[in-house]
Amino acid sequence: MTLTPEASKSVAQPPTQAPLTQEEAIASLGRYGYGWADSDVAGANAQRGLSEAVVRDISAKKNEPDWMLQSRLKALRIFDRKPIPKWGSNLDGIDFDNIKYFVRSTEKQAASWDDLPEDIRNTYDRLGIPEAEKQRLVAGVAAQYESEVVYHQIREDLEAQGVIFLDTDTGLREHPDIFKEYFGTVIPAGDNKFSALNTAVWSGGSFIYVPPGVHVDIPLQAYFRINTENMGQFERTLIIADEGSYVHYVEGCLPAGELITTADGDLRPIESIRVGDFVTGHDGRPHRVTAVQVRDLDGELFTFTPMSPANAFSVTAEHPLLAIPRDEVRVMRKERNGWKAEVNSTKLRSAEPRWIAAKDVAEGDFLIYPKPKPIPHRTVLPLEFARLAGYYLAEGHACLTNGCESLIFSFHSDEFEYVEDVRQACKSLYEKSGSVLIEEHKHSARVTVYTKAGYAAMRDNVGIGSSNKKLSDLLMRQDETFLRELVDAYVNGDGNVTRRNGAVWKRVHTTSRLWAFQLQSILARLGHYATVELRRPGGPGVIMGRNVVRKDIYQVQWTEGGRGPKQARDCGDYFAVPIKKRAVREAHEPVYNLDVENPDSYLAYGFAVHNCTAPIYKSDSLHSAVVEIIVKPHARVRYTTIQNWSNNVYNLVTKRARAEAGATMEWIDGNIGSKVTMKYPAVWMTGEHAKGEVLSVAFAGEDQHQDTGAKMLHLAPNTSSNIVSKSVARGGGRTSYRGLVQVNKGAHGSRSSVKCDALLVDTVSRSDTYPYVDIREDDVTMGHEATVSKVSENQLFYLMSRGLTEDEAMAMVVRGFVEPIAKELPMEYALELNRLIELQMEGAVG
């Protein structure tokens, strides 16, 4: 989903945030940010359990040739015979009888995103996948949902050169000879229990053939998603790079304005929000943005105007809003005279708000306006500064004349009490009370204070120019006593106060949109719901003979005490605010969405909306893929994986390539998330001068085990291999490097280098290294290095002494740690990998 863009000529800078405590940082590590589940009609009807009948049914549904059926049945018998491996992670939690081995999500593969069923299309829109194709960042795209590829496309110029990029099922149908020649030759069914399982029940995946001499310079890309609970995904990828060709295949399991409330109370257009910025969630607290998505909308936009007209915002139909339906809290009295049904205030205050799709939210329903709960700033300012800032917002300006700085405050000549208040504050803060100029014919009293420090303080914390004024992060994070003092001074200078029915009504006007909404946010902290109304200028005007340019004026109004308006109800941590108007329009424009750390929400004009996020179920799912690659003489293949499965997935993958004479095979592997990952990309170097390389990084959080590594078999002379493995563990997580380098007899002149580096964030995590080196030839160069380390306090001290915060210092250390892998990725994926690890590590001190 998403929000429509707000045009903005200038973008405010991201707010400065206090570093997370170690406990907060560690609690946030390893959090999986894509845990929504779509409707699951197909999965609900799928058969559980594995048997010969299930295997025959899969083959029949795909109308496969008999040789493939026989291959599947043979593999099933091997799977039944082989025991669960005990040498690695604990796999006892896998219940093979409870898994759904085939779920068909759509009857027909789509050639365009628009042809996909709406629920599946929305999923990939949320993940931002079509955008990469639109921007020509990839040469071809495949998207697998459940058991089958639902979308497939390849660039026409590559197709004309003979490049084949199909889903594996279509590859079997359309190119049976090539398929049969290579299928199972690199990874036979008998290799291990899970390769046997995959061979028996495989479905989906990618089939790629690159003709001799053809170079595919832009990556081919595939996305895999499990939506169904207890689903097993068993894609089979087969890549053949013919002689002298090159291809880069990228596989990913993670994704790629309205005014959004940032953590300092500022409002910024959604398109200006960046990864790493802090926004306010529906709990009122600051949370990090972990991803920004954009797509083109061709559909309905819903605009909601709450009780506060300037807070109106627009969202797409499916975007969840935090709301309370009026029908659930209304009294039994009938609606009359155009008024909505009255509500029972007790029911409303005790009702539990819930996430409801925008299209299902009606006029009269209640939206949730959370009360901000910012992190208190470590610098506590005196109340005199609060009063001075309040008067400056209302009546002050900072003046720089001939290099001389001053603060000037303009009051009515009758407001001498406020004049003295300003002078006393300046005297206390800057030891200067300034001068007062009374001009009776203008009914004015002007205070001028020459102060360099005061000028800088107001400039930096409140701003210069009436329409540009807003409070800094430092001021917004002061306590309620400070803010109440500031608001009272502001009302003294620029407000109107009346009393009706025992309530005090307060109203102020400002030309600064940002200050108007900051004030609304501050008042919510103080227990008052304020409305904001925009008044457009009527055109140029003349005041006392001078032409003036009129600007938009924002009126902010609220009540204190007595029997004020009760349409918005104070519900403790939030206000329940009624929707006054709901409108729908057809839109053809870009829309944006943010992924935000738990609680997965942000505020649009102060109101709670949900970020769109891959499903997390209480029971486990199984991902058991097989990737076979044949690299012909002098060809080169690079295979990049960035996986971010939810922490209920067993991720058990067999990946192996055969590199022939002069060929190069490169595996770039990033593993984040999952319950258990067991993955060891391998290269069998069967021809002279073949090269194999594995660069991998793994992150293990609480209750996660990343058992990863590599296998290199030197089967011919003058072959070379390189393994670089990086791992990070925290919160009791475990990482393991498990590797094999084998140099067979006759593979003289071979060279191999292995480097394993592990980083432990805390004292409860674990890292293991299980290297196995088998050298059967004399003329061999072999190097192995393994390190386990914590983030050094000396490193942090050195960086912080250069002006970095603890957060920034930690982030720099982590970036350097993963840099050997990140630099090998395409730019978008390097940023994504760095983002995932860097944000998770931020604030955690080893």
Curated annotation (Swiss-Prot):
Going by the entry's taxonomy, the superkingdom of the source organism is recorded as: Bacteria
Domain (DOD-type homing endonuclease): residue spans on this chain: 388-528
Q: Name one GO molecular function term.
A: endonuclease activity
Q: Which PROSITE patterns match?
A: INTEIN_C_TER, INTEIN_ENDONUCLEASE, INTEIN_N_TER
Question: Some GO term, biological process aspect, for this entry: which one?
Answer: intron homing
Q: Name one Pfam family in it.
A: SUFBD_core
Q: What is this protein called?
A: Iron-sulfur cluster assembly SufBD family protein Rv1461
